Amino acid sequence: MNDRLNTIVDLKRYPIHDLNSTIIKNLVKKCKEELDQYSCSTIPNFILPKSLEVMNSELEKQLDEVYMSKESINAYLYAKDDPSLPDKHPKRNFMERYNGYLNSDCFPKNSEMKYLYETEELLKFVSACLGISPIYRWADPLACHAYNVMEPDGILPWHFDSCEFTLSLMIQKPEKGGIFEYCPNIRAPGNENFNEVKKVLEGDRSRVRQLKLEPGDLQIFKGRFTLHRVTKVEGQKSRYMCIPAYVLDPYSCLLYTSPSPRDRG
């Protein structure tokens, strides 16, 4: 283990460098159970406060590189209507998205997040929590550990991910709003469950769970079959999330909820 990892991750609480430790075995078991039941697991205060300050500073130095965009999309990440479907079909329900991305290549090679992302310790720990092996670092130099930036009034509407799983690290939370909401396993392979999806899109909250992330928290999430969103950011502070991307195929092309200068998705 490189000594630098010890300055980024709270290894006393989460010794991810030792997957055979009782602490990590219990944590992995907990994460697997939560992912199986809710498609979501959170590890609080994973990042040390001083490292969090470094990450925040590195991001804010590059804010002029953030690509912000607005568009109207449906829950399936498409912006084009399909008039062949019934008027009330969930694929014809379009919602406002306003957010931006800061590409991975905006950061120096020795940046805090780049170092953490490239450690074997984090990759193997995430693989254990997911119960999936092998997983890989994404070969895309622009998006492998990009930041999702949501300025005041930023919003991510209800949607499904195009990938099996995602990681998120909360770097800065807004003064109000910016809450992660999700409906676990609302659809399944071979069953889109359009009626239940339609209910959620129209305001039914009977299946909705909320997750109030704090800076330093690590979230592991399976979003392909779980409808989810981030509520509107309120106040003066932006919401910063880093999205370290581990994938089943390092050369895959993923569909994102917003484009970048390279026209993602």
Which ranges hold each PLM region?
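Signature of the catalytic double-stranded beta-helix
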Residues: 47-50, 54-66, 84-140
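Short beta-strand His + acidic residue motifs that chelate non-heme Fe in jelly-roll/DSBH
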Residues: 156, 227-234
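Fe(II)/2-oxoglutarate
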Residues: 1-36
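Short amphipathic
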Residues: 41-46
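Catalytic core of non-heme Fe(II) oxygenases with the double-stranded beta-helix
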Residues: 106-114, 123-218
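Conserved small/polar residues in nucleotide/adenosyl-binding loops
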Residues: 256-265
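A short hydrophobic beta-strand segment most commonly corresponding to one strand
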Residues: 168, 236-250
